[in-house]
């Protein structure tokens, strides 16, 4: 059995990243895929579940994990730590399961430095106007917060050229097909097929 592939997925807020990842998992139940769940020291919000949205841990425990080198990447945001578990990702990949890592461009850089074989996907909105419309439609943020998100989006988008693949999420179904095409193409690469079908290949090449 071959190893799974780590997919780094980045996008500006409102581009549809989370929806595409969720749909990919939901519509392809036979694919061996999981989403990485980050650790955080912030408090649990209403509706959140430990181990589903985040692994909620105490600051002291998080800092102990940092000391032990158990995070692929971590950052402190507004006084709270957020980090990606190295152990969980490596164990999951070793089982032949692909892992999606939803992360920003800065975290993506850290991950690529440590796991250069990871594949990266950047999801773009079709226009700034459409991105702003989607943020407004969600009804979650004030005008000031939306303006801040739009400014952050420009910074995030400027790093699209650091990624292996780019998906334009203009039509959701088309973007989802593009997403699946990337996963399929990666699974059909020679090294993946050789690991998956080693027995068959040995038989085909036997005298």
From Swiss-Prot:
Binding positions for ATP? 11-18
Q: Which PROSITE patterns match?
A: GUANYLATE_KINASE_1, GUANYLATE_KINASE_2
Is Nucleotide-binding among this UniProt entry's keywords? yes
Residue ranges the record marks as coiled coil: none
The subcellular localization recorded is: Cytoplasm
Which keywords accompany this UniProt record? ATP-binding, Cytoplasm, Kinase, Nucleotide-binding, Transferase
* The keyword GTP-binding belongs to this UniProt entry's keyword annotation: no
- One Gene Ontology MF term: ATP binding
SUPFAM superfamilies for this protein: P-loop containing nucleoside triphosphate hydrolases (SSF52540)
Enzyme Commission no: 2.7.4.8
Q: What does this protein do?
A: Essential for recycling GMP and indirectly, cGMP.
Q: What is this protein called?
A: Guanylate kinase
């Amino acid at each position: 059995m071959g190893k799974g592939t780590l997919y780094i997925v980045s996008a500006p807020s409102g581009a549809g990243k989370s929806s595409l990842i969720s749909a990919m998992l939901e519509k392809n139940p036979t694919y061996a895929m999981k989403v990485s769940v980050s650790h955080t020291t912030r408090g649990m919000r209403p509706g959140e579940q430990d181990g589903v949205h985040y692994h909620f841990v105490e600051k002291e425990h998080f800092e102990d994990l940092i000391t032990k080198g158990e995070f692929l990447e971590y950052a402190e945001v507004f006084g709270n730590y957020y980090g990606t578990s190295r152990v969980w990702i490596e164990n999951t990949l070793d089982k032949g399961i692909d892992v999606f890592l939803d992360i920003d461009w800065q975290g993506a850089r850290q991950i690529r430095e440590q796991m250069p074989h990871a594949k990266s996907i950047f999801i773009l909105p079709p226009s700034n106007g459409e991105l702003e419309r989607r943020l407004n439609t969600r009804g979650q943020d004030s005008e000031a917060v939306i303006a801040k998100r739009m400014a952050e989006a420009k910074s995030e988008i400027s790093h699209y050229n650091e990624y292996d693949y780019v998906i334009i999420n203009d039509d959701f179904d088309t973007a989802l097909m593009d997403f699946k095409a990337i996963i399929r193409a990666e699974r059909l690469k020679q090294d993946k097929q050789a690991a998956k079908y080693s027995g068959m290949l040995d038989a085909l090449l036997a005298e």
